[in-house]
Amino acid sequence: MDGVRNLTVSCASSNTCNDTIDDFRNQVYSTLYSMITVVGFFGNGFVLYVLIKTYHEKSAYQVYMINLAVADLLCVCTLPLRVVYYVHKGIWLFGDFLCRLSTYALYVNLYCSIFFMTAMSFFRCIAIVFPVQNINLITHKKAKIVCIAIWIFVILTSSPFLMSTSYKDEKNNTKCFEPPQXNQAKYHVLVLHYVSLFVGFIIPFVIIIVCYTMIILTLLKNSMKKNISSRKKAIGMIIVVTAAFLISFMPYHIQRTIHLHFLHNDTKHCDSVLRMQKSVXITLSLAASNCCFDPLLYFFSGGNFREGLSTFRKHSLSTMTYVPKKKTSLPEKAQEIYKE
């Protein structure tokens, strides 16, 4: 589901279309995956390092961000295999197991990111819109339970992607990351696609739209205008998560739907084949780029990022200093539980 195969297809005029986009594909994938690997590794590695060092604060936000960073790093570690594959012009060198694992890791990361962002948006909505009624829903322990459930759900439901095996082409070169060739396999992939489309994209997207609408309406009220810090954090999260969905997740799921139906057509125009193959390369790269959005989520929605760095640098001094906390109201306590 995530590759671009070197297709020779029958055109409407019954001529053979031998044009390919191999050079375009290899250059785009190798370049963009290399960039995503570097940015994703150092960005998520840095965020994870700071979060672990300041984990004594134990906020729900930290739990979600740690899990996001871990999911990104696991995916980023497999991207160099893809880079080598496309640098070697579509020849797989690492065996069938790593071929399956690389495909699996990309989709586990993709849908873990979507579900973690959705959970963060939902509980941020609870903390802002209903801080008093549902304060027990946004605790550190509840966040852990939600994250464990997401990991188990995504790992199990993404297991069919492990069927994306390597194979030998007509030149006896080992291939990986290519679309299915048998009609039965195409049907199974199409069913899997629609399940992941609705459960893994459409439903989470609807949830975040509803949550962000409620958050924005609440922030526009006079009672919330006093809490400038909360407003900035919520707005930062809305911007980054919405950008991730519109730039990374949405184009990929739309294009994947069109592409899978396109593969079922017996007659394909050469120009359409080439355009479809190019769109696969671009949208799949955008989907992988979600690894770069997650550090931005921490930088821009985490209002206390600099404070976290300061806490990390001076942790030994802060543990020796006692600063009494002021009494807080229930709405403020809800924000404190979900603080960055």
Swiss-Prot record:
PROSITE patterns: G_PROTEIN_RECEP_F1_2. The chain crosses the membrane at residues 32-52, 61-81, 110-130, 145-165, 197-217, 234-254, 280-300. Residues 53-60, 131-144, 218-233, 301-340 are cytoplasmic. Keywords: Cell membrane, Disulfide bond, G-protein coupled receptor, Glycoprotein, Membrane, Receptor, Transducer, Transmembrane, Transmembrane helix. Disulfide bonds join C99-C176. The keyword Cell membrane applies. Belongs to the G-protein coupled receptor 1 family. This is Cysteinyl leukotriene receptor 1. The gene is CYSLTR1.
